[in-house]
């Protein structure tokens, strides 16, 4: 899981090998210190530690009924394998972590060896994850049966991500590392952190510290720059790119708590209309002298902190009434006149373009939500994230932009395929919460695109908006269903068997709970997953 590009094996063959939790890594190619440390760390994380955790446990089962369970094979063990041989073919096997690096691998298991061939360490890391899923427990032994096995694998999309939103309900630093570990286990490679919104501002700004000091419930949940640098490195050690988002010009009410006046004050209008979640209407005040210097500083700090190639500047859901109904509207009109802006829509575009320019000036690629493209405000260097109107995806790529898609992958919704422009899509979804993973699995918005159009689609992101998730339910709400998104982004377009996916995802969930990285995630359906006993504490 996700299902590989090519798999060959002997169906129900008892021919098997055994291995122990002390199995060793054997790197046969040139690999410098950083390369070797990466491989050793990930081999221990993905193979050695999980096997140690599973010692003495029973094998995973789908059912008590043999007819519908996984193949029950009594393995005939021909040998005990003591090492996993890894060969890397690139002269630079550990390139800079960026979208488009080679993640392919070949994994072969025979009666006398386990071998992995990859171009880079990132491909080898994926192979470790696949190898772990081949290992089963039989008579207190770790075995791989149905030999020989050969798996050739590579991702369908370059960008396979998850957006998390700690600005609605906070998440602790440790949670982010568990999220990265879980993403790596399903071969995802991007973590997008939504660092600010109307409700709170969780990013530490050294230039404008009152943003987080006044704009956060508790400073213990502020994501400091030192932690985010550490997190970006932690992600790199798992092959996961970490990048941040500061949303502008809307969703910025929290900025005003630290720097009064930088957000246009339309609270009277919001209260008078009894608007639900009205704080989301407020937008930045262009007439305030602090507004644009703060944007400058934040884009620079984001660029420097994460060190990756991407900075998300938001741009979604701008309500022009947030300006027209504000107490500062006359000053805003004067600003518009000084800049030659004839409408509030043009003012929105001014903000969009300004934020992108700052990111480009810092040598990074801007990422924006679809509205920035839809209103003609996207720079050609900008990546467009299509989140609502999936019809825009084709328009985006035909206009020469790179795109990622999130429409149909909203993990805060029970009806993930419900399109705002077509109410008929909001009815034929599964009523059971757990089976909404099938709706996400069916979501493949590039199927109708031509080959040339698909070249501009980098991939996609699942989105976990945080209004109703915190540390108590995050993993269950998100990762119980993210496996469907992960397989859609990795596996071939022809891989469409939802029941097969559920069995494989359920087993991977069991493995991940056993190795302490997917704790709190419920099963996809009935199954048996024995967990290691924990020592009781007083």
Swiss-Prot record:
Keyword Ubl conjugation: no
Compartmental location: Cytoplasmic granule; Secreted
PANTHER family associated with the record: BETA-HEXOSAMINIDASE (PTHR22600), BETA-HEXOSAMINIDASE A (PTHR22600:SF21)
Subunit annotation: Heterodimer of one alpha subunit and one beta subunit.
Reaction catalysis annotation: Hydrolysis of terminal non-reducing N-acetyl-D-hexosamine residues in N-acetyl-beta-D-hexosaminides
PTM annotation: Glycosylated.
EC number assigned by the record: 3.2.1.52
Biological processes annotated in GO: carbohydrate metabolic process; glycosaminoglycan metabolic process; N-glycan processing
Protein family according to the UniProt entry: Belongs to the glycosyl hydrolase 20 family.
Keywords: Glycoprotein, Glycosidase, Hydrolase, Secreted
Active site, per annotation: 317 (proton donor)
Record's protein name: Beta-hexosaminidase subunit alpha
Glycosylation site list: 44
Predominant location: cytoplasm
Superkingdom to which the source organism belongs: Eukaryota
Gene Ontology MF: a single term: beta-N-acetylhexosaminidase activity
Any GO CC annotation of this UniProt entry: membrane
Gene that produces this protein: HEXA
Pfam families per record: Glyco_hydro_20, Glycohydro_20b2
Role played: Hydrolyzes the non-reducing end N-acetyl-D-hexosamine and/or sulfated N-acetyl-D-hexosamine of glycoconjugates. May contribute to amoebic pathogenicity and may be involved in the destruction of extracellular matrix components.
InterPro entries referenced in this protein's UniProt entry, alphabetically: Beta_hexosaminidase_sua/sub, Glyco_hydro_20_cat, Glycoside_hydrolase_SF, Hex-like_dom2, HEX_eukaryotic_N
